[in-house]
């Protein structure tokens, strides 16, 4: 709330406004922003922002950030990728085999945890664990390796 007893009201008409000689208390005396962290702001930066200045470690020029990206799915969750209609067809008609392309659903690797129903199926994936491969073949299915 404005009122007449504020200092700014009292100092109207006085050139320096209580900041000494003309030209003082203007602009950016310490520089703008993070200017001078190794010079005139050294103590503050070293105290409150340790590690801000200098190089740390080495650069990896040919770094592949997604090198180890390999989302996996267990055998127990494999049937959740199949629609209910396809499941019913596979249960009734034994001549039809279900094809599950795991990569289309966003997974790369099939792990061997869990059991499969006694329905043959073909699974396409980039990688299979030995137990997953064994259990899929026990049911009468097949494992197909897929490149991309």
Curated annotation (Swiss-Prot):
Lineage: superkingdom: Eukaryota
The UniProt record lists the keyword Lyase: no
One record GO biological process: translation
Region (Disordered): 1-38
PANTHER family: 60S RIBOSOMAL PROTEIN L27A (PTHR11721), LARGE RIBOSOMAL SUBUNIT PROTEIN UL15 (PTHR11721:SF3)
Family stated for the protein in its record: Belongs to the universal ribosomal protein uL15 family.
Residue spans of biased composition, Basic residues class: 1-30
Signal peptide extent: none
UniProt keyword list: Ribonucleoprotein, Ribosomal protein
GO-annotated molecular function: structural constituent of ribosome
Any one annotated GO CC term: cytosolic large ribosomal subunit
Keyword Ribosomal protein found: yes
This protein's name: Large ribosomal subunit protein uL15
């Amino acid at each position: 709330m404005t009122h007449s007893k504020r200092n700014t009201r009292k100092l109207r008409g006085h050139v320096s406004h209580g900041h000494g000689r003309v030209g003082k208390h203007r602009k950016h005396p310490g520089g703008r922003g993070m200017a001078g962290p190794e010079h005139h702001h050294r103590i503050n930066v070293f105290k409150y922002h340790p590690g801000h200045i200098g190089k740390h470690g080495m650069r990896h020029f040919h770094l592949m950030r997604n090198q180890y990206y390999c989302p996996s799915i267990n055998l127990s969750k494999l049937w959740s990728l199949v629609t209910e209609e396809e499941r019913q067809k596979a249960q009734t008609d034994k001549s039809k085999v279900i094809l599950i392309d795991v990569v289309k659903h966003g997974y790369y690797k099939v792990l061997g945890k869990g059991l499969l129903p006694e329905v043959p199926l073909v699974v396409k994936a980039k990688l299979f664990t030995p137990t997953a491969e064994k259990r899929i073949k026990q049911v009468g299915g097949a494992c197909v390796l897929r490149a991309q």
